[in-house]
Amino acid sequence: MSNKKVIKLIKLQIPGGKANPAPPIGPALGAAGVNIMGFCKEFNAATQDRPGDLLPVVITVYSDKTFTFITKQPPVSSLIKKALNLESGSKIPNRNKVGKLTQAQVTAIAEQKMKDMDVVLLDSAKRMVEGTARSMGIDVE
């Protein structure tokens, strides 16, 4: 890949194992000239062990219309909703609380998300998770 020139970076959030050519994937990749079905098959094969998780993916498109992609960990808000079995956060976060997150859950989420965060210390990652939880209307014990 030393001579290939990067022409576009595409960032999407796609449920694991459920990529299909429908919007938003099709139009984003079609505009870059990428083989849409080729991407969908590769992505679904790579993420079949994480069905239903909303996965951020960064697709790098090269000048010869080939591509590579990197999947990341699900967003913190998705991990919190999954841990508490919630559909969504509170509409009014400072008034209506929709759940409680224990320190053990905060630590587990922070450890899972650490490699995608720009932090070195686990305590910093935990504070980021706690802040996201508070903005969703979730109390942190």
UniProtKB/Swiss-Prot annotation:
Could you list the residue ranges forming a coiled coil in this record? none
Q: Which GO terms describe its molecular function?
A: large ribosomal subunit rRNA binding; structural constituent of ribosome
PTM note: One or more lysine residues are methylated.
Range of residues in the leader sequence:
none
Biological process terms from the Gene Ontology for this record are: translation
GO cellular component, as recorded: cytosolic large ribosomal subunit
Q: How does it assemble?
A: Part of the ribosomal stalk of the 50S ribosomal subunit. Interacts with L10 and the large rRNA to form the base of the stalk. L10 forms an elongated spine to which L12 dimers bind in a sequential fashion forming a multimeric L10(L12)X complex.
- Its recorded name reads Large ribosomal subunit protein uL11
List the taxonomic lineage: Bacteria, Pseudomonadati, Chlamydiota, Chlamydiia, Chlamydiales
Gene that this polypeptide is encoded by: rplK
